[in-house]
């Protein structure tokens, strides 16, 4: 797992409130196009966390997973996990799978999530992503999961969709999906505006039905070979351009598109300034008084594109008021200073992705964004 993304996943685990159980069966969409497979995502947290179902083994065993573009490991609990956090999880039974193989080339590892920890051993087995079958895929079997934060989490395991720092690594599952003329090394994510609606993750392509009519797809070159990042040149509010990235060496910031983070995270001083400009009257009783703002990105042709968020997008009641921001509003902002080669990082999580459909192209190393339905 990328070290950098240990903390961002903690944002989604600790910054949202559990409000209901998953009452409907997770399922695969019947409307997937030939060559692609769409997995329906169901919500279990206020507007923030969406969980999908995959199967592992022969015969298949089903698991609920959180799809995370900020990490690179796929792991699920083992039948040998006796920790309290594993009690309410579906556990993988390797004894009943005909294709299970222990991975002798790797030792067990610890993966840390803030104060939490998962201990995994590596194995290979067949992974089923709806109609797509990935044979002999490497994944992690968790023999231990810490009580905090995993006891209260409704997913069984984590499905990493990040970019590996090791360019020779062949363990990433989307790299191993069988290719054909209609199935590409692409996956795309749609998050609904409300937890009551279904989201979707599509492997092998993208689905235009999740894109708002007349909305174009803008394409952005991935600016880091380690993470799903794009070039961010600034923030606009009321026509005022905040050059939050002007002090960086290259003149831009790296903005991570991260499904494993619930909020929008960024440099502390930048977010303090932004909240002051959004809400000068210090009142949140009427959200219409709050201003809109836009992230500005540089596309693959060097053209600046603006992606606007309104108060309906960035004010979320499930978020606590952040003491650092010193503002009474429930901003879905997380002040945090994380360094990168191009200065401090911004992390655009599910608050952003509920407004914009995201397409991740591995072969071309680019990300597509379009306004979602």
Swiss-Prot record:
GO terms for molecular function: aspartic-type endopeptidase activity. Keywords: Aspartyl protease, Hydrolase, Protease, Signal, Zymogen. CDD domains: pepsin_like. PROSITE patterns: ASP_PROTEASE (PS00141), PEPTIDASE_A1 (PS51767). GO terms for biological process: proteolysis. Disruption phenotype: In the mosquito vector, midgut infection and oocyst development are normal; however, sporozoites fail to egress from oocysts and their gliding motility is impaired resulting in a failure to invade the salivary glands. Processing of circumsporozoite protein CSP on the oocyst inner surface is normal. In the mouse host, sporozoite invasion of the liver is impaired but the growth and development of asexual blood stages are normal. It comes from Plasmodium berghei (strain Anka). Coiled coil: none annotated. This is Plasmepsin VIII. Belongs to the peptidase A1 family. SUPFAM superfamilies: Acid proteases. Its EC number is 3.4.23.-. Residues 1-21 form the signal peptide. During the development in the mosquito vector, plays an essential role in sporozoite egress from the oocyst and sporozoite gliding motility, which is required for the invasion of salivary glands and subsequent transmission to the host. Residues 50-370 form the Peptidase A1 domain. The gene is PMVIII. The active site is at 68, 258.
